[in-house]
């Protein structure tokens, strides 16, 4: 082997790396903040580009010293840096959530450890004013060895952290050769078991910094706010001569470029820093996510300028309530991985910008860097755009939980889980190192309000030490660590340095229980509302709970984006996206990585639109339509609604806009307060009337444009006849001279309605199997009673019960049917059941079909459920219409899909679409495209019209795909249209929830009543 086995040595985490420091970008002169264009610094040389590359399936296959000066690399391939080697055909992708992809045997990894040899040549010119050279790697997975010009430089690990080497003595004037050996696995792999695709390579920027001999090396900026202004304390360490500190001038400028404070460093008595400066700013403008005001700080020395930014803000807890700038904080957050379907975990600034801008557009104010440090400019952008950040260390050892145990009781699992790593003293140095790499590099970012020690590692001495160091080093921020929740009985644990209790996916009852105990620490939902596929469905309920308790400081939805690998375009034009199991890997977790609010290409899921409106900046708490008094509450943390938004209101009648107006708020409504404003509207006597109040941005921000809608409220208005008038029209019977003729046999009732309509009713199923109008058959398959839906990702647990109950194989069975004519109408009475193979009857149904002389069919069903069975996915009627029924009109909640617990993205109205537009194309096919609270549905074909309406509202789906097709296929590009327009008319569907990883579906959204009735009318023309 050509390298020492540092990769299996817990005592060698780094070799020859520089001490941890804050991130900054030096230059020879004032070149601006260098956030968006750091490569413009004249002291930075970016080494990204195409590098020579050779892949080896095993480190034992690498026999030649490829790093030696003059080594011939003509047999090497080329690969882009930054980049992931799996994306270029080397090795293969693997997605696993909890389980390690290797045996659980720390610190050892498989002997056949894949590796990649990188070689890159670059030019270097010495600078007498900046003779020192530092080589920076911002992200390499999993570990790497470095050589320059054939001479060994050093070794490092921790994939998502910066490794810096002093390479001054290794460089020469002119052409230099950099060689890097990257290994797929190392002992650090056991601490990098995050829920993501396992990707390898140099995936972040590589660059050289030129610096003077004597220089500011590290600094820590903290701010405090007093009655007379703000105090800025800057502690620092210097390299080189002792006069470097006194020769460094500090200048602070405001956003407008005016100098507001100056100072110099003086020696201080501090455990971590040798120098300190204290500067005062009078009448400071504070930083917060809604008004992210940043000052600029310049460190000026003879041969170097460092420019950074300061956000003045103060964080503290009073009891169990978090205050930021003396305001009770509520985190409206989301978890974010570095992920792109083409570039994988190698994401650049533009990709990060797109994510953060979308977050701001959808009313997020916080992001958790799950579960590792991001690129340094991620945090700088959060400073600038206005997002709170929970900065998380690169530490997850969740796979230790899955070790094989005879005793699989949870208490024993936790005890053994903790012993492996979290409570193993051998891992204290590695855990401390990862914590410090996170904290030290980003310590100057005002957006960071909380340090997280990691994710799902269990708890023990490693984290006790890390938390203790963090609180001592940075008492200005809060700490959290969710896995402290997992306690074993082998010892007493120290939780004193955890400020915020973190929990994942708690049920509402658990939150209530925590709050009832009058906790002394805030509760944070570090992960909640699992957004996998069609979901989440419980956002509004969590929002209400977060508002109910001051001690519940908010939460972070899991997660931002679907993780998938783009594989090109299918013949049908759809994108091909691979997830776990699509790459030939044996150990994988399927599509559990497809759990975001946006698709891999950042197209929003309906769940993201749902989130945006639930977390709108204001809400109407009450509206008195008699007086026009409207109580408006400000849900922002800092801004006054008067300065932030204006209102657009509209009154719609049966989906048609009746009046529109605009209101400028002329009175102050401070954050967290409410005020009554006047909004009188005229309301017609008849029709379903809604008042929609939209909240529009008043002025441009750096991210958002004026007039953008930030959300809306919808209020049902009362009038004399509040029914939808089109529905009344559809429900009304048309007077005709048609007479009924019925042909009866053991199997069928064949009903002729006048000369044009013929219906065949199957007496064995109790349902129609043929509807003919003017000789044209409208049904392509018999009608069905339908209780199945293609399981959503959030049905992944309950679907096992559903399939065990054979819901997916259920069908209608009639026991008796009779046909009578009464009052000019034909009545078909039936007693039937919904049954399935191997199990008892699921449902008993009493049905009455009423056919009127105009050919309309009305059905009334009384349903009784056997309580032995689980909740139903849905209940309704499924029809297969000719595919020329392509034009859809409906009145209900749209245009986004809607369900009983996922309906805030849309509003009541009249909508038009074609059938394909009604389909939400989730990459793993599942139930989608439902619309709830509907008054009527109309489908128009080339010659005929089919409509449905009810005295009570109903739910429906219209799709080119069957639920069987959606159930069977693993990818959306595999879906085949069935050749019909599939129409599901539902009493209701079961709720969506977030039970793929979260709590069970709330009771109020379950279709589990013992008895219910369903009534709907179908109009055929």
Give the positions of each predicted feature.
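An acidic-aromatic loop/edge-strand motif
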Residues: 87, 92, 99-108, 157, ...
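Extended substrate-binding grooves/exosites of carbohydrate-active enzymes
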Residues: 1-39, 96, 151, 190, ...
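Extended acidic/polar, glycine-enriched regions
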Residues: 172-175, 235-316, 689-727
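Catalytic cores of secreted or luminal carbohydrate-active enzymes
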Residues: 194-216, 572-631, 635-656, 682-727, ...
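Beta-strand/loop-rich accessory regions of lumenal/periplasmic or secreted enzymes
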Residues: 87-89, 184, 288, 680-687, ...
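Intrinsically disordered, low-complexity Pro/Gly/Ser/Thr-rich segments with frequent PxxP/GP/PP motifs
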Residues: 265-282, 655-686
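Accessory beta-strand-rich segments of carbohydrate-active enzymes
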Residues: 3-15, 33, 37-38, 52-56, ...
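Beta-strand-rich binding/interaction modules
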Residues: 148, 230-266, 629-634, 638-662, ...
């Amino acid at each position: 082997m050509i390298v020492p086995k540092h990769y299996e040595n817990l005592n060698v985490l780094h070799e020859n790396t520089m001490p941890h420091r804050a991130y900054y970008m030096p230059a020879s002169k004032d070149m601006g903040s260098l956030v968006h264009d750091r490569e413009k610094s004249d002291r930075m040389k970016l080494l990204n580009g195409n590098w020579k590359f050779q892949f080896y399936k095993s480190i034992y296959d690498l026999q030649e010293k490829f790093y030696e000066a003059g080594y011939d690399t003509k047999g090497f391939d080329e690969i882009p840096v930054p980049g992931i080697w799996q994306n270029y055909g080397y090795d293969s992708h693997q997605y696993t959530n909890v389980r390690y992809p290797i045996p659980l045997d720390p610190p050892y990894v498989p002997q056949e450890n894949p590796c990649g040899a990188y070689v890159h040549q670059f030019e270097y010119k010495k600078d007498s004013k900046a003779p020192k050279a530092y080589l920076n790697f911002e992200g390499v997975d999993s570990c790497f060895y470095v050589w320059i010009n054939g001479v060994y430089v050093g070794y490092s690990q921790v994939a998502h952290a910066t490794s810096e080497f002093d390479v001054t003595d290794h460089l020469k004037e002119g052409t230099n050769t950099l060689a890097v050996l990257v290994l797929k696995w190392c002992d650090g792999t056991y601490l990098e078991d995050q829920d993501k695709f396992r990707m390898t390579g140099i995936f972040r920027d590589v660059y050289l910094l030129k610096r003077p001999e004597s220089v500011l090396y590290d600094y820590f900026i903290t701010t405090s706010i007093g009655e007379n202004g703000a105090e800025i304390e800057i502690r620092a360490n210097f390299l080189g001569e002792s006069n470097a500190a006194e020769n460094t001038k500090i200048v602070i400028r405001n956003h407008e470029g005016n100098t507001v404070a100056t100072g110099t460093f003086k020696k201080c008595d501090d455990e971590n820093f040798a120098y300190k400066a204290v500067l005062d700013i009078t009448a400071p403008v504070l930083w917060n996510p809604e008004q992210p005001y940043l000052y600029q700080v310049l460190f000026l020395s003879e041969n170097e300028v460092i420019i950074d930014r300061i956000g003045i803000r103060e964080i503290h807890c009073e009891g169990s309530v978090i205050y930021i700038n003396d305001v009770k904080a509520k985190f409206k957050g989301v978890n974010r991985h570095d992920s792109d379907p083409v570039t994988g975990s190698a994401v650049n600034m533009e990709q990060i910008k797109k994510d953060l801008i979308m977050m701001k557009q959808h009313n997020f104010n916080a992001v958790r860097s799950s579960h590792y440090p991001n690129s340094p400019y991620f945090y700088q952008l959060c400073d600038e755009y206005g997002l709170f950040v929970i900065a998380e260390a690169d530490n997850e050892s969740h796979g230790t939980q899955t070790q094989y145990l005879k005793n699989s009781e949870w208490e024993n699992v936790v005890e053994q889980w903790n012993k492996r790593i979290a409570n193993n003293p051998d891992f204290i140095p590695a855990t401390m190192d990862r914590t410090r790499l996170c904290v030290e590099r980003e310590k100057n970012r005002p957006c960071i309000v909380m340090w997280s020690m990691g994710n799902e590692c269990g708890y023990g001495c490693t984290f006790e030490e890390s938390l203790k160091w963090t609180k001592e080093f940075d008492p200005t921020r809060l700490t959290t660590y969710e896995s402290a929740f997992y306690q074993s009985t082998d010892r007493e644990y120290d939780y004193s340095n955890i400020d915020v209790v973190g929990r994942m996916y708690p049920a509402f009852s658990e939150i209530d229980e925590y709050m009832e105990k009058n906790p002394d620490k805030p509760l944070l939902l570090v992960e909640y509302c699992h957004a996998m596929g069609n979901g989440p469905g419980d956002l509004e309920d969590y929002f209400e709970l977060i508002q109910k308790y001051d001690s519940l400081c908010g939460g972070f939805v899991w997660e931002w984006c679907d993780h998938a690998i783009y594989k090109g375009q299918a013949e049908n034009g759809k994108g091909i996206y691979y997830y776990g199991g699509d790459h030939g890997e044996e150990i994988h977790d399927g599509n559990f990585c497809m759990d975001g609010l946006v698709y891999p290409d950042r197209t929003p899921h309906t769940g993201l639109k749902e989130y945006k409106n639930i977390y709108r900046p204001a809400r109407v708490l009450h509206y008195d339509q008699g007086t026009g008094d409207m109580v408006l509450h400000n849900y922002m943390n800092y801004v006054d609604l008067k300065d932030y938004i204006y209102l657009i209101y509209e009154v719609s009648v049966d989906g048609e806009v009746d009046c529109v107006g605009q209101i400028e708020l002329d009175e102050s409504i401070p954050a967290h307060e409410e005020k009554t404003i006047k909004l009188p509207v005229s309301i017609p006597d008849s029709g379903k009337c809604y008042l929609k109040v939209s909240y529009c941005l008043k002025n441009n921000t750096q991210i958002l444009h004026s007039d953008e809608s930030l959300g809306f409220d919808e209020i049902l208005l009362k009038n004399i006849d509040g029914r939808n008038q089109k529905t009344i029209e559809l429900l009304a019977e048309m007077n005709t001279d048609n007479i009924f003729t019925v042909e009866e046999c053991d199997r069928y009732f064949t009903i002729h309605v006048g000369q044009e309509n013929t219906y065949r009713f199957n007496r064995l199923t109790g349902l129609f199997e043929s509807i003919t109008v003017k000789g044209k058959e409208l049904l392509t398959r018999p009608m069905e009673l339908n209780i199945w839906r293609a399981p959503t990702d959030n049905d992944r647990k309950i679907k096992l019960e559903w399939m065990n109950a054979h819901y997916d194989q259920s069908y209608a069975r009639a026991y008796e049917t009779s046909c009578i004519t009464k009052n000019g109408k034909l009545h078909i009475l039936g007693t039937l059941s919904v049954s399935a193979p191997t199990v008892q009857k699921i449902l008993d149904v009493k049905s009455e079909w009423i056919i009127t002389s105009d050919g309309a069919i009305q059905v009334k069903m009384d349903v009784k459920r056997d309580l032995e069975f689980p909740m139903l996915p849905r209940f309704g009627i499924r029809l297969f219409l000719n595919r020329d029924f392509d034009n859809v009109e409906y009145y209900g909640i749209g245009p986004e899909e809607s369900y009983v617990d996922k309906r805030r993205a849309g509003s009541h109205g009249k909508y038009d679409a074609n059938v394909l537009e009604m389909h939400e194309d989730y990459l793993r096919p599942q139930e989608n495209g439902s619309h709830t609270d509907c008054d009527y549905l109309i489908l128009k074909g080339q010659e005929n019209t089919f409509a449905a309406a009810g005295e009570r509202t109903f739910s429906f789906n219209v799709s080119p795909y069957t639920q069987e097709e959606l159930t069977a296929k693993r990818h959306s590009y595999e879906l085949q249209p069935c050749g019909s327009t599939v129409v599901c008319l539902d009493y209701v569907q079961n709720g969506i929830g977030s039970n793929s990883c979260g709590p069970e579906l709330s009771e109020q959204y379950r279709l589990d009543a013992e008895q219910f009735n369903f009534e709907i009318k179908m109009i055929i023309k």
